[in-house]
Structure formats: C-alpha cells, structure tokens
Amino acid sequence: MKGRGYLVAVLVGLTAYGLVLGCDRIPGKPTEAQRPLLSSQVSNFNEIYGRSCAGCHGGDGQLGAARPLRDPLYLALVRHDTLRQIIAQGVPGTTMPAFSERFGGGLTDKQIDIVIDGMQNRWGRPQTFTNVTLPPYSLEDARAVGAETGDLERGKTAYITYCAHCHGPDGSGGAKGGAVLDGAYLALASDQALRTAVIAGRVDLGMPDWREAVAGQPMTPQDIADVVAWLASHRQRLPGRPSGAGQGS
C-alpha cells in the first residue's frame, strides 16, 4: 500500500508540474524548429529536388531514366520561362508530369523557381557559351531563323552522317549507342525530347552534342530539324504489337 501511495503521489506531482508549465512544455513535445514543414513550406533546393525530380533525373542531376539536368549546355539552351512551363505544366503525351499546384501537382510557384534557380546556380555554366551560337531549342524557334519543317530524305542522310556510327545504320543500336528507332522509346520520347537529345546529347552517357558528332562539322538548324523528323516518322501507332495484330478477324 505504501508503494502504491508513493506512485500516486508521483503521478499527481507530474500532472501538477505539467499544468504549471503549460502544454507547450510537455516533455517529448517537439519544439517549433523540430516540427516537420508542410510540403508547401519547404524552401530548400536539395529537398524539393530530391522529392520531385531525382526519381527520374537522377539524385545529382544525372544518370537517371530521363534527361540529365546537371548539364550546362541544356541549361543554357532552355529559357527560364520555357523550363518553368515544363515543370509547372508537364509535357502531355510523355512521362513528365505537371508539378504546379495549379495543374494538380504539389509545388508552389515559389518552389518551382527555387528548383530552376538551384539548377542554374549549381549546374549552369553560362559563361562557357558566351561566344557560342546555340541552335534554336524548339522547332518553332528554328522556323524563326529560317529552318524549314524537317524533310525525311534529308533526315535519313543526316542520320547516317551524324548518328549511325553510334546508333547503327538502321537505328537498331550499335557498340556505343542504343536503338533510337525502338517503338517503345519513340512512344515515350516527344519530338521536342528527340530534338533536345540531338542538340544537347547526353553528357552523363557520353552522347555528343550537335557540335561533336562529326569533328569540324556541327549540325545546322536544318540538319537537326531533318533528323528529328526522320526519327519521329518511325513511331508506331501501337508500339510493341506485331504488324497486323488487332485487326478484324
């Protein structure tokens, strides 16, 4: 009985102690600094990038399934407003989702700017391209400087000249590069994704950019438009299905 009375006294004392100090001083309650932030309150680039981008683009911006973002050429090629639109709205018809809250994602406008500024500050090298005339990023931009819509015959010739030594003469892959005419790949890669790959290469995989495929002979805006058109012309309506499958019986 004596031991039980002592225990009761201790509990009463602790209760009184808690009442005196108030709820904010309850032992074990996290401090303000220890409380987890709401996702919309996170303002650290590494955390936002890690949650939203690393799964596809790689933990340090490279060697992911999607385009490397740790690429000074790519960051110099794409305008801030274009990059912002891509992140905010996603790319329809591809695996790039919309991240803006306004389009069903989880990032605020401020967080999207943090991602863009963080990539530019960490991985951008704008001074490297001060005296370099970059190709137009999009086909629309290319048309503005006189490039025509891509031509398939010219595109095949451009492919043989600039791409076949890595990806094979028939696009089925070679010693250095994968199959670029694979139906599943072309179903996942938009025309703009193909264009970006031709211009910027894949710095993390050793794929050359538009200047490097043939020494001393950089691709022109027209070459780029032509080879992208030729690649895109090989898309299948139902990739992965044998020819004739699904037709009426």
What residue spans do the PLM features occupy?
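Electrostatic cytochrome c docking/interface patches
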Residues: 24-47, 129-158, 244, 248-249
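Axial heme c-ligation environment in periplasmic c-type cytochrome domains
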Residues: 64-71, 89-133, 174-179, 200-226, ...
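Generic alpha-helical secondary structure signal
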Residues: 39, 43, 81, 110, ...
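Gly/Gly-Pro-rich "capping" loops immediately C-terminal to redox-active cysteine motifs
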Residues: 35, 42, 46, 58-88, ...
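Mature, folded catalytic cores of secreted/periplasmic enzymes
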Residues: 79, 83-87, 133-153, 164-166, ...
